[in-house]
Amino acid sequence: MENKEKKQMLTTKLTKEKNGGSAGMIQDMSINGIKLQVFQNGTGGPVIFWGMYPHQQNEVEHLWESLLELVPEQNFLLVAFQVENWNRDFSPWEASAVFGKEGFAGQGLKTMRWLTEECVPHIDRTFGVKDREHWLMGYSLAGLFALWAAYESDVFSGIVCCSGSLWFPDWDHYVRDHVVQ
C-alpha cells in the first residue's frame, strides 16, 4: 500500500473516531493543475476554501482535526488548495522583496480567477453546495490574498485572515481606495 493511501486511510479512521463513527468524506483532486484536498463533515454548513502552500500538507489534517474537536456537530466542507509559488500566486500586485531576495510577482488575480471561475463552480457542482455560504481563509500572505479577494469579488460571504501580511507594500493605499464587495 502506498504512503498516500495509508495517510488517507489514517485520516479517515481518525475522522470516524472523532465524529462518533460516521466518517467524513476526504478526497484528493486537481483542477487545472492545482491540487485540492476536500474534507466533508456532514451534509450542510459553510464551504471553506483555504489557500495554502504545498509543504503545509499536515496543516490541513491538523485544521480538520481541530475543527472536529472544537465543533464536532458543525457541518462544513473544507477545500484546501495548494498554490505552486507562495510569493507569486498570492500577491495581489508586483512588489519588491521585503524579506529575503524573492520579490512578489503579483499573480494573485490569476489565482483568484482560477478560484472563482474554475474551482468554486467545480466544487459547487461536484458536492451540490452552490446555495451554501462560501468562505475564503488564509494565513500570512494567503490571509492578505483572502482579504484582497473580499475587495475584488462577491463570491465569498466570509473571509478569515489569520496573521495576514498587511505590511504588504501599498496595502494601506489599496484599502483606502476600494470597497469590500
PLM features per residue range, with description:
Residues 6-181:
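Non-catalytic cap/lid and distal C-terminal segments of serine-dependent acyl enzymes
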